[in-house]
Amino acid sequence: AAAAAGKNLHEVSNIVQETCNRATMFGLIDTVDYLVKGGRLSKTAGLIGSLLNIKPIIVTRNGEVVQYAKTRSFTKSLRSIRSKLESDSDLEEIGIMYTTDPIIANEFADSISDLLPNGKKPYISQLGSALGAHMGPGGLGVGIITK
């Protein structure tokens, strides 16, 4: 939009950087198996996580990936993210990315669309293969941009 509005490369770059500074990405992981296969989690931690049916939620802010929460079901993970979004009164945009299941992405989008201003709807797209390989089947990404 900025380029179409006649902004030069430097101005567009500044707008992109400023938007990135307001962005947060959550990753809801349905199975820890692919974190182990990708070397992101030890085999021991993966075994324990699988046995206990742990569903980790990670968050990426300013290029740093950290654990946000651990739940015992994917439904609880979705509730945790909805609760976080409800506490953010300055939401501007929400994007939902899925690895293999667009139905879950669409259902979650419907359940949180009331949180965006002016009747906006969340963007929905399939996650790229690089991130999808680490998140595994059933993974869901939720990206937010705040004002």
Model-flagged regions — what are they?
Residues 1-147:
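Mixed-charge interfacial surface used for oligomerization/domain docking
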